[in-house]
């Protein structure tokens, strides 16, 4: 799995997952809706109601994890053996086994989400979040040991990835106690996007550099440029989330206006017009009464005489 496809495939999955999460979070922010129990699931009783209730993110994890497992098993020509038959025996393919462990946990996380949302009578949110947190904890441990024999540019690339995974672990752990906090979901989505885009960038840095020449580990400018690239990814992903929020806000505003019947719009217009006219009429009558009051007070002595 230590090749171009092995890095860009998980990166693509994380980017798509982050974009999906960004749309969900934007919708919840715009409509002031629940993130775990959105209102459209209970209101939608039409023809496509069952489609909306499918655990899309869970199935995405299951399919992506299964494909990555198959790819990892086929990467080793001799077969992914665990130990040699020599004496003393030695462990074989440690990094490949680490990759396989990551993808198995991703698949299990998706299975837990699918079962919780689509099979069980009552959704177990704590179980879903717990499975995700467990996967990220294991991912962090594997990545820390994954870079033991790395140096130079490769070490810097993976160190920045470890930083993102560590922050994601903290956010997901906090969500166990505050699962409906929107701020945590926004940060989580941003970190997923950053991790995915950085994995894709790492595939080009380590295996297919744009210049056609491998990066030199002993050149400090390369290390600095890698960090600069990472900062660019942070800014681009932040702008991407802002763009998704803006587009979602515009779409929901137009969608709501389009769904409002014409009759209701006219009724609202007439009601508002009649109300405004009635208020103006009341003000005019009150002003006439105030103007007539001094005249009546002046004419009253003459009438008495």
UniProtKB/Swiss-Prot annotation:
* Any matching Pfam family: DUF716
Query: Which cellular components does GO assign to this protein?
Result: membrane
Q: Where is this region: Disordered?
A: 285-305
Per the UniProt record, which residue ranges are transmembrane? 4-24, 51-71, 100-120, 124-144, 159-179, 187-207, 223-243
Q: Which organism is it from?
A: Rattus norvegicus
Among its keywords, does the record have Membrane?
A: yes
Q: Which UniProt keywords apply?
A: Glycoprotein, Membrane, Transmembrane, Transmembrane helix
Q: What is this protein called?
A: Transmembrane epididymal protein 1
Q: Where in the cell is it found?
A: Membrane
